[in-house]
């Protein structure tokens, strides 16, 4: 089955065509500045379109050059927020599209853009099966004590204020890969997965199910990220409001000017590491704060899963920054974690163990592949519906 995987943003459209049977990527690309001018990159030169419908025409042309007479069988969409309704991928129809739109208040920057992609596909290929794969779905198994905030019940019942979690597609995919590497059925996998990119989250997995995760009502909660603060005292927001900051100013501060950028002046982990190694005190502090925050979460989630059978690093930083992994590992000695310096420093695109034989908890690096996960989920839903 050939699946077109779509990640539709408000001004961008990322696409990839996967052959599900062979796991191969046939073509991929990114169209940017939709409605804003020219922009695009991929296997062919793509100029910026007026809207998502025009963007899709350009995607179609680029795909046709590669596929020739072969045709797409389905489209899988990354949808950021599935709320409490969607706990698994679903075949999209008009009612599902409207349900996703009703969740717009919970993800105002993402869900409306996801729907633009869905509607563009439906207009161009009305008979094409479309499947929504939700970032939040894997975390629908969180027990109430993990997803509840200690605020009046009316905030949950009237406004849906609770912890949802994100990066679920990645965490689920990586948990299966990690279990296979350890020769365990996924139903017996108890572990902690750290998805570390510009956005970062850590998830506690028990029996193959998510039982806690660091992101909450929004992707702002939790770890120190590229430009997001992660956890902080909520009274700081009240303090800033009383000092004259607008809600827009505070939102921008916490989501776009904080994290590594706020601490070190740069949101790119590679640059922060280089600066730290060159003696930059701000960069060293940023790494210390970020690694300490993650280590605290890992310790707590070791308890949440009843004793972790594995600690797994994934995503851009988790897969590639051996120095950051070492900083985190050094803080986990109380759990019996011991990284092998040689294995940790090796680069590979394959799942691998980077801990010593004496480590009480195996430490793994497992590359994530969200597009593959979305393509496989899409194929499964379409097959079950046929």
Swiss-Prot record:
| Swiss-Prot/TrEMBL cofactor(s) | Mg(2+); Mn(2+)
What is the first-listed, main subcellular location in coarse terms?
Answer: cytoplasm
Which residues constitute the signal peptide according to the record? none
Q: Where are the transmembrane segments?
A: none
What are the binding positions for Mg(2+) in this chain? 7, 370
The EC number on file is 2.7.2.1
Q: How is the cofactor bound?
A: Mg(2+). Can also accept Mn(2+).
GO process annotations (BP): acetate metabolic process; acetyl-CoA biosynthetic process
In this chain's numbering, which residues are marked as the site (Transition state stabilizer)?
A: 167, 228
Q: Which family does it belong to?
A: Belongs to the acetokinase family.
> What function is annotated for this protein?
Catalyzes the formation of acetyl phosphate from acetate and ATP. Can also catalyze the reverse reaction.
What is the protein's name according to its record? Answer: Acetate kinase
Which species is this record about?
Answer: Arthrobacter sp. (strain FB24)
> What is this protein's gene name?
ackA
